[in-house]
């Protein structure tokens, strides 16, 4: 799930997915707080800083068409072990070791 429009629906989506035993992977850790199995995506604060840099460049005269497309340089992993247990999924230790956040 990657659409920002779904953010406010993260709890009902997570509840419904768990009810139907459907593992979900989202783009922000708030989804794992709500019950999604995992989230993996760039840190939002870093994205906000990049956006602010682009806005500053545009406001100081840069043409938007001349600005390069930038890709995230890092990503954060969050996993929800409660959801994993409810779904009968074992998260490998190597994945848990890589996670920035693990919900017990």
Summary of predicted features, one role per range:
Residues 1-104:
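Short hydrophobic alpha-helices and adjacent helix-cap/hinge residues
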């Amino acid at each position: 799930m990657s659409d920002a429009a779904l953010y406010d629906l993260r709890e009902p989506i997570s509840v419904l997915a768990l009810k139907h035993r459907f593992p979900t992977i989202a783009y922000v850790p708030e989804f794992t707080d709500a019950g999604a199995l995992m989230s993996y995506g760039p840190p939002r604060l870093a994205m906000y800083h990049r956006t602010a840099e682009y806005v500053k460049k545009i406001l100081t005269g840069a043409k938007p068409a001349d600005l390069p497309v930038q890709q995230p340089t890092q990503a954060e992993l969050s996993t929800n072990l409660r959801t994993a247990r409810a779904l009968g999924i074992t998260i490998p230790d190597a994945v848990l070791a890589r996670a920035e956040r693990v919900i017990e």
